[in-house]
């Protein structure tokens, strides 16, 4: 009799993806973030579902409905803070996952990488719309500033912005549609993530050396299932420490003030995970130029496979490229810091230099380093 795990049409799919999957024997903890992202997504969908049961997407009641969730709903406060801080954990895992892909050359799996870039953009859009829903000051002004950037598009800009707003300013129509999109997008993300996984399993995982591991595979279960469970426990530990001890650490105090179109907060800034892109946007004095730089700062990821010049896949044995990679990480941290600072000297100059360095590292220095390393190895 054949094993049901291997013969049942549905169980067979699960088996081939999570149980009998041949995996490289040497993948490190940097390969844990894929499963952690899956856990984050499920957690966000579940907490979000319970929040949606008590939330009202109307400008007059949105703020008080969130207050009601925190004060009157059973365990509403923990659900709300798990959802808000879960987004932060989601982005930490996302950036680690992308960084791993850059470092170890995983971007040579073109379909998997490009779908990953689409996933990143979709998650960013979802998080942005979610931040608008509590209808605090930063929600309202963040929505106003970011949607208003589209008005920089020549000819159709103004019409486009008013079409997105559903009026002449961010108002009830905007909040309602943002709630609708924020609800549906995570399910779309889940579907795209399945395609991401499908394409990954066509080629199999990369590994730290960047060398084919076909000669040395081990079954996913029990080795990597137990490893993923450990990662999941650490993720939940970190999330719950944040939720129970410092729930507002990563939030903005301005968002505890109800949205007021007549009063602009002194410093409009997005959540911490968008600050690097926000700093690049602000570093260019021209509106359209800033918008293009902002878009390109994320879309540049799609160009990474074309910019790979080295004859080695991974950076494991390429010290020159390693130095530049960590310079890029430091540069992104600098941009994140600058994005949260007011627009004044010396922050403006630091932001401009960090923005130039960001594009210089990716477009010029790293491809050059790859070529130099080939020459040094007489390849």
From Swiss-Prot:
Protein encoded by which gene: MT-CYB
Extra information: Heme 1 (or BL or b562) is low-potential and absorbs at about 562 nm, and heme 2 (or BH or b566) is high-potential and absorbs at about 566 nm.
Keywords: Electron transport, Heme, Iron, Membrane, Metal-binding, Mitochondrion, Mitochondrion inner membrane, Respiratory chain, Transmembrane, Transmembrane helix, Transport, Ubiquinone
Cofactor: heme b
Gene Ontology MF term list: metal ion binding; ubiquinol-cytochrome-c reductase activity
GO cellular component: a single term: respiratory chain complex III
Chain positions recorded as a ubiquinone binding sites: 201
Subunit structure: The cytochrome bc1 complex contains 11 subunits: 3 respiratory subunits (MT-CYB, CYC1 and UQCRFS1), 2 core proteins (UQCRC1 and UQCRC2) and 6 low-molecular weight proteins (UQCRH/QCR6, UQCRB/QCR7, UQCRQ/QCR8, UQCR10/QCR9, UQCR11/QCR10 and a cleavage product of UQCRFS1). This cytochrome bc1 complex then forms a dimer.
PROSITE patterns: CYTB_CTER (PS51003), CYTB_NTER (PS51002)
InterPro entries named in the record: Cyt_b/b6_C, Cyt_b/b6_C_sf, Cyt_b/b6_N, Cytb/b6-like_sf, Cytochrome_b, Cytochrome_b_C_euk/bac, Cytochrome_b_N_euk/bac, Di-haem_cyt_TM
Binding site residues for heme b b566: 97, 196
Membrane protein topology class: Multi-pass membrane protein
Location within or outside the cell: Mitochondrion inner membrane
Main location group: mitochondrion
One of the GO biological process terms: mitochondrial electron transport, ubiquinol to cytochrome c
Signal peptide: none
Transcription regulation as UniProt keyword: no
Comment on bound cofactor: Binds 2 heme b groups non-covalently.
Entry binding sites for heme b b562: 83, 182
Protein name: Cytochrome b
Similarity-based family: Belongs to the cytochrome b family.
Pfam families: Cytochrom_B_C, Cytochrome_B
Chain segments annotated as transmembrane: 33-53, 77-98, 113-133, 178-198, 226-246, 288-308, 320-340, 347-367
Function: Component of the ubiquinol-cytochrome c reductase complex (complex III or cytochrome b-c1 complex) that is part of the mitochondrial respiratory chain. The b-c1 complex mediates electron transfer from ubiquinol to cytochrome c. Contributes to the generation of a proton gradient across the mitochondrial membrane that is then used for ATP synthesis.
């Amino acid at each position: 009799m054949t094993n049901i795990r291997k013969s049942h049409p549905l169980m067979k799919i699960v088996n081939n993806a999570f149980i009998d999957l041949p995996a490289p024997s040497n993948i490190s903890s940097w390969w844990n973030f894929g499963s952690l992202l899956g856990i984050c997504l499920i957690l966000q969908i579940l907490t979000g579902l319970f929040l949606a049961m008590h939330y009202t997407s109307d400008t007059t009641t949105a703020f008080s409905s969130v207050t009601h969730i925190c004060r009157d709903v059973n365990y509403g406060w923990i659900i709300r803070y798990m959802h808000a801080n879960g987004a932060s954990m989601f982005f930490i895992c996302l950036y680690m996952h992308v960084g791993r892909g850059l470092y170890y050359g995983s971007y040579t799996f073109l379909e998997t990488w490009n779908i990953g870039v689409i996933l990143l953009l979709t998650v960013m859009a979802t998080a942005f719309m979610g931040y608008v829903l509590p209808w605090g000051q930063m929600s309202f002004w963040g929505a106003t500033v970011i949607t208003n950037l589209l008005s920089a598009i020549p000819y159709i800009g103004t019409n486009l912005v008013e079409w997105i707003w559903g009026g002449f300013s961010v108002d009830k129509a905007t909040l309602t549609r943002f709630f609708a999109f924020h609800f549906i997008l995570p399910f779309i993300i889940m579907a795209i993530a399945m395609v991401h996984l499908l394409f990954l399993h066509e080629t199999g995982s990369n590994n730290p050396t960047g060398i084919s591991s076909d000669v040395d595979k081990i079954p996913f279960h029990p080795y990597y299932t137990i490893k993923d469970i450990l990662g999941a426990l650490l993720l939940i530990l970190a999330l719950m420490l944040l939720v129970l001890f410092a729930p507002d650490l990563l939030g903005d105090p301005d968002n505890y003030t109800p949205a007021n179109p007549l009063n602009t907060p002194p410093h409009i800034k997005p959540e911490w995970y968008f600050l690097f892109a926000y700093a690049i946007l602000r570093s260019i004095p021209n509106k359209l130029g800033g918008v293009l730089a902002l878009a390109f700062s994320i879309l540049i990821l799609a160009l990474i496979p074309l910019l790979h010049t080295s004859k080695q896949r991974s950076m494991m044995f390429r010290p020159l490229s390693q130095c530049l990679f960590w310079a890029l990480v430091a540069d992104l941290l600098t941009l994140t810091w600058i994005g949260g600072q007011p627009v004044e000297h010396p922050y403006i100059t630091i932001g401009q230099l960090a923005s130039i360095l960001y594009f210089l590292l990716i477009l010029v220095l790293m491809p050059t380093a790859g070529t130099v390393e080939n020459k040094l190895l007489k390849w």
